[in-house]
């Protein structure tokens, strides 16, 4: 089945019965992020600011923190872009065909991508997380070592000196129960992370994934009962018994490091930040003896893109 894309400038393709999920609160660590300019020693300052946008149509709250690192002893300027906020889950029953058949739209993946146009002088030099993550929680403190490099400390220490490095005020943290993070082929112009559904236990049965199959019951990922006497729309698993990302959404917390030559003639850079949600179509139908489930992958893609302008001389980032 052909994938259909929903962007922030088009109308939604789901039926009107799907309501927008309330956007969950961003991680409470936001209140600990200090904005303004900080002198971290060795002739180096860190200037931090934030930008917030809300794509109501697609249920995406984008919060970007940025930190310019100005090390007068180094020939390049650095910018750390931290992408946070919330991508709503939108786990919703979207269709009913009588009592015996119904469809559920559910989020199988969340994505964040940053991309520099090919003609930009600036380059992506690093990113966190740097690898794929399959644990429930990820945490890393970003530090600067006065050598032109930002590094991540996965012990999650906050503030002060960490070895020979100094914290720049950012500790990344996010949770992904029943999902895993995949780093998507980074280059010096593009980096992205895909947080994709892995598998899940359904009421002590399973685990089941997007491809699970039983010859009698089909895919049982979101099947509440195998033989229950209820409408199909009432036989989907309650969201409070599934991964929190399905109903409450995903709160990303990724970081990208951009470098810029101090001697470059043009000290302005454009960068695109893209948030995305991929949804599968899970169907239940009654076979005359039992319920049977099917799952169609990647049925809907909801995308929200924002272009930001970086001014390296003024140490400002705007949208």
UniProtKB/Swiss-Prot annotation:
<protein>
    <recommendedName>
        <fullName>Alpha-hemolysin</fullName>
    </recommendedName>
</protein>
<comment type="subunit">
    <text>Self-assembles to form first a non-lytic oligomeric intermediate and then, a mushroom-shaped homoheptamer structure of 100 Angstroms in length and up to 100 Angstroms in diameter.</text>
</comment>
<comment type="function">
    <text>Alpha-toxin binds to the membrane of eukaryotic cells resulting in the release of low-molecular weight molecules and leading to an eventual osmotic lysis. Inhibits host neutrophil chemotaxis to the lesion region. Heptamer oligomerization and pore formation is required for lytic activity.</text>
</comment>
<comment type="similarity">
    <text>Belongs to the aerolysin family.</text>
</comment>
<dbReference type="GO" id="GO:0005576">
    <property type="term" value="C:extracellular region"/>
</dbReference>
<keyword id="KW-0843">Virulence</keyword>
<dbReference type="InterPro" id="IPR016183">
    <property type="entry name" value="Leukocidin/Hemolysin_toxin"/>
</dbReference>
<feature type="signal peptide">
    <location>
        <begin position="1"/>
        <end position="26"/>
    </location>
</feature>
<keyword id="KW-0354">Hemolysis</keyword>
<dbReference type="InterPro" id="IPR005831">
    <property type="entry name" value="Aerolysin/haemolysin_CS"/>
</dbReference>
<keyword id="KW-0732">Signal</keyword>
<dbReference type="InterPro" id="IPR036435">
    <property type="entry name" value="Leukocidin/porin_MspA_sf"/>
</dbReference>
<dbReference type="GO" id="GO:0090729">
    <property type="term" value="F:toxin activity"/>
</dbReference>
<dbReference type="GO" id="GO:0051715">
    <property type="term" value="P:cytolysis in another organism"/>
</dbReference>
<dbReference type="Pfam" id="PF07968">
    <property type="entry name" value="Leukocidin"/>
</dbReference>
<dbReference type="InterPro" id="IPR003963">
    <property type="entry name" value="Bi-component_toxin_staph"/>
</dbReference>
<keyword id="KW-0964">Secreted</keyword>
<keyword id="KW-0800">Toxin</keyword>
<keyword id="KW-0204">Cytolysis</keyword>
């Amino acid at each position: 089945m052909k994938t259909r894309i929903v962007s922030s400038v088009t109308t939604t393709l789901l039926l009107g019965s799907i309501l927008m999920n309330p956007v969950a609160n961003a991680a409470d660590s936001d209140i600990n992020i200090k904005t303004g300019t900080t002198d971290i020693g060795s002739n180096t300052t860190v200037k931090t600011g934030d930008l917030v946008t809300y794509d109501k149509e697609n249920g995406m709250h984008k919060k970007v923190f940025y930190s310019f690192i100005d090390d007068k002893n180094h020939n390049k300027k650095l910018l750390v872009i931290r992408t946070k906020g919330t991508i709503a889950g939108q786990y919703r029953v979207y269709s009913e065909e009588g009592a015996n058949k119904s469809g559920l739209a559910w989020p199988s993946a969340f994505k964040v991508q940053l991309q520099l146009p090919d003609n930009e002088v600036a380059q992506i030099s690093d990113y966190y997380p740097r690898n794929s993550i399959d644990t429930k929680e990820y945490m890393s403190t970003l530090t600067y070592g006065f050598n032109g490099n930002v590094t991540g400390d996965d012990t999650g220490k906050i503030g002060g000196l960490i070895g020979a490095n100094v914290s720049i005020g950012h500790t990344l943290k996010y949770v992904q129960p029943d999902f895993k993070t995949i780093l998507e082929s980074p280059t010096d112009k593009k980096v992205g992370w895909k947080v994709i559904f892995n598998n899940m236990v359904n009421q002590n049965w399973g685990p089941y994934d997007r491809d699970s199959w039983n010859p009698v019951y089909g895919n049982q990922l979101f099947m509440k009962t195998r033989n229950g006497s209820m409408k199909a729309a009432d036989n989907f698993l309650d969201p409070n018994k599934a991964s929190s990302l399905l109903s409450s959404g995903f709160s990303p917390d990724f970081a990208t490091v951009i470098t810029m030559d101090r001697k470059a003639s043009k000290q302005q850079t454009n960068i695109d930040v893209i948030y995305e949600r991929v949804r599968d179509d899970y169907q239940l139908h009654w076979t005359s003896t039992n319920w049977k489930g099917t799952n169609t992958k990647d049925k809907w893609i909801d995308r929200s893109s924002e272009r930001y302008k970086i001014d390296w001389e003024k140490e400002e980032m705007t949208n």
